[in-house]
UniProtKB/Swiss-Prot annotation:
InterPro entries: Aldolase_TIM, Ribul_P_3_epim, Ribul_P_3_epim-like, RibuloseP-bd_barrel. The active site is at D36, D177. Catalyzes the reversible epimerization of D-ribulose 5-phosphate to D-xylulose 5-phosphate. Its EC number is 5.1.3.1. This is Ribulose-phosphate 3-epimerase. Binds 1 divalent metal cation per subunit. GO terms for molecular function: D-ribulose-phosphate 3-epimerase activity; metal ion binding.
Amino acid sequence: MKPYLIAPSILSADLARLGDDVQNVLNAGADVIHFDVMDNHYVPNLTFGPAVCQALRDYGITAPIDVHLMVKPVDRIIPDFAKAGANYITFHPESSEHIDRSLQLIRDCGCKSGLVFNPAMPLSYLDYVLDKVDVVLLMSVNPGFGGQSFIPATLKKLQQARKIIDESGYDIRLEVDGGVKVDNIAEIAAAGADMFVAGSAIFGKPDYKQVIDQIRTQLASVSA
């Protein structure tokens, strides 16, 4: 099993002082910064463009940036985020006319590529593109807004995705996003996830280190 990665979502950060807040959460022990990109077309919200990603790099953030594209179409914006400093770029299969091509484009731009599955979306989109996938991201809420509750059916889906990944033999991360918090992260990890997006569960607390330490303790109980 890969080392667990904690990826706070800046959707829940203090946007008025984003650089400071991101640095603080990294200092507290986060591994990756998760970047929710919404276009008010594919999902009913509008968030961040490549300029914000570039601004974090210019500020001095060196941690991996995990860009989750909730936009349609996707191909136009992929090179812009790669140039702005993204390390991972993931998208929803139904938002691309040519999934294989979009995955290859991400890799051609020097980033790790991934597919994102909404709660009711089947995993069958993976069948013919596993060789081009570095990350499988399962949404455990319906995308668009932070602060929602974890959808329990995601646990079974995580188990299915873990089986697919393990049997493929490829080096693929299994990420989960939505409603992840201290009191459910252990069962989420036990179902097979190794990368965890948490927004309000971390940024909504006054002491980031305390909550990340609590998360690490829960994760250690799974791998023990």
